[in-house]
Swiss-Prot record:
This is Polymerase basic protein 2. Belongs to the influenza viruses PB2 family. Influenza RNA polymerase is composed of three subunits: PB1, PB2 and PA. Interacts (via N-terminus) with PB1 (via C-terminus). Interacts with nucleoprotein NP (via N-terminus). Interacts (via N-terminus) with host MAVS (via N-terminus); this interaction inhibits host innate immune response. One of its GO terms (cellular component) is virion component. It comes from Influenza A virus (strain A/Brazil/11/1978 H1N1). Plays an essential role in transcription initiation and cap-stealing mechanism, in which cellular capped pre-mRNAs are used to generate primers for viral transcription. Recognizes and binds the 7-methylguanosine-containing cap of the target pre-RNA which is subsequently cleaved after 10-13 nucleotides by the viral protein PA. Plays a role in the initiation of the viral genome replication and modulates the activity of the ribonucleoprotein (RNP) complex. InterPro entries: Flu_PB2_2nd, Flu_PB2_6th, Flu_PB2_C, Flu_PB2_CAP-bd, Flu_PB2_middle, Flu_PB2_N, INV_PB2, PB2_helical. It is found in: Virion; Host nucleus; Host mitochondrion.
Amino acid sequence: MERIKELRNLMSQSRTREILTKTTVDHMAIIKKYTSGRQEKNPSLRMKWMMAMKYPITADKRITEMIPERNEQGQTLWSKMNDAGSDRVMVSPLAVTWWNRNGPVTSTVHYPKIYKTYFEKVERLKHGTFGPVHFRNQVKIRRRVDINPGHADLSAKEAQDVIMEVVFPNEVGARILTSESQLTITKEKKEELQNCKISPLLVAYMLERELVRKTRFLPVAGGTSSVYIEVLHLTQGTCWEQMYTPGGEVRNDDVDQSLIIAARNIVRRAAVSADPLASLLEMCHSTQIGGTRMVDILRQNPTEEQAVDICKAAMGLRISSSFSFGGFTFKRTSGSSVKREEEVLTGNLQTLKIKVHEGYEEFTMVGKRATAILRKATRRLIQLIVSGRDEQSIVEAIVVAMVFSQEDCMIKAVRGDLNFVNRANQRLNPMHQLLRHFQKDAKVLFQNWGIEPIDNVMGMIGILPDMTPSTEMSMRGVRVSKMGVDEYSNAERVVVSIDRFLRVRDQRGNVLLSPEEVSETQGTEKLTITYSSSMMWEINGPESVLVNTYQWIIRNWETVKIQWSQNPTMLYNKMEFEPFQSLVPKAIRGQYSGFVRTLFQQMRDVLGTFDTTQIIKLLPFAAAPPKQSRMQFSSLTVNVRGSGMRILVRGNSPVFNYNKTTKRLTVLGKDAGTLTEDPDEGTAGVESAVLRGFLILGKEDRRYGPALSINELSNLAKGEKANVLIGQGDVVLVMKRKRDSSILTDSQTATKRIRMAIN
């Protein structure tokens, strides 16, 4: 009060008023304002006040050589007075106008490259289609979404290194560009931005937009890929939505989508192999998505989906601490529980051993089409508030929550036996047994659950066992809400462990994920997925298995041939022959294998019966565990194209056709590759030509190591000896000649020598 009186008193004196209104603000005030590092309290006032001055801008001295002192109207553009406290010139806003009209014009060629993300956005919007506006209640839930279409997926640190390398290549500082994507981007950008005159800082900001994924936690109803998020403000309000089809796709959305499909295929395939974890890792490491190694994408891409997270866990990467059940992501928001094993009886009197969670807990459940809040105690559902896009989605959420609650009335609602199996034909664990059972038909479950009268609460409504809404009654504890439940925003990642059956656990031993949680939904990937692993051959059906198996043999023929003669058992056990077995009728697999192995043994024993084409053709059949029998076959059956097709033991067939003239193999009419060596028997001449420059010393001598193929001989030094595998599948010892003169006679003597050495 006192101070206000004092101020009033001062203001009543005319001298005070004069001082405050007439005196110019000295530069000290401005310097103080600049240098005291406080947040600007009134930016708009400050701006107006600065711009009201004659020279609000300071510029480098060089500006005086580039801009005249006065413009055409005779107005002063810069002051001869130096800016106090710096050696810069004070400049009028009119100088900016002059520069824009008369300043030098630089090349605009770099603009579209620097502002790439903006130019692309304009194109997408130009070609996008906006549909009708619908007025309806919007169930929005906050989700972590990608707000920056068209970016690469580098981490902030990786991007920083790339930007420094591109924009400030000569700056000091350790920069290590390791990942493939970093190197590719750096090279590409350096080329694009040669002679670029745009300010480096601006270039750096724009590059950041292009390289790093930016996510925000936004309320969304509808599409969550980045090309939808960029028009979120145009497509959904509080009570309306506008239909929109993007005018283009961006690679980051395609990568996310294709990654999910690849991960699902790999987890499903690994789950049925003998060692799921090893198989999964082998497949992740040998798969490419859109030309980039899948493991590189997994390291950089933050997509959270069950299969993707299983792959990440296998690679030792951190994943989200929420767990998955019935396709919903559960996040505990309060409470705690301990686990205890308990035996329970189903309505069919089948005994189930379930791990009961004892204690009060609250969860958020987030699925693709429905969300819920669940409060539960030990084997009791207290409250479930669901919201979903349609009735079907709401049913799914209720079933999952009821099973998860482990209530007795749910277990007693089971009719019939529970014997669901996974893809590897192993019984599912009890909780998933119950889930599958009620997902098939929830009628009894809902009927047995019980109903209760409800209070009228804003935005909530009851739901009856037959899924009709009601304001009077509802299934016990269950309510349907108009509002969605937000996804869990915390993006913390935790260290997890994974066992060989691909069950992922947190450090307290709670199972977060298992292959049962991986969706069976099939989609078509946007980017090409290349699975190099033989385990994925069957993804495109039996024909692909057949073609891929033979392609593999032909590609690796040099090593296969040596193993065939020296270590056949190891060859038969190769995992590349595993998928082929599913094509051979089960009842006869063993006989085929025994027959082919015997045939091969005869080839090894009897000189001159080595037949490349026949070995390639029959080899996959030898991989099954053999049954000894006297049976002979003239053709072998494989199940492709919905029926049994025959492969002739001698000669060509539609399934396996080798053209001697072109040396091309076609399998079911598809090209399976070219044989690089002549598989015809009567051609000892080929060997003799190849062995020119080598002396044949006699039979194989194990002291000189494993047999080399003819192609590998060229590496020998003069006078060096080695065993070599020749066309008939026999091994002889040779020495590289010390002199070149006698080479001509080699080819004539080679043929005789080979015969002698073998006999």
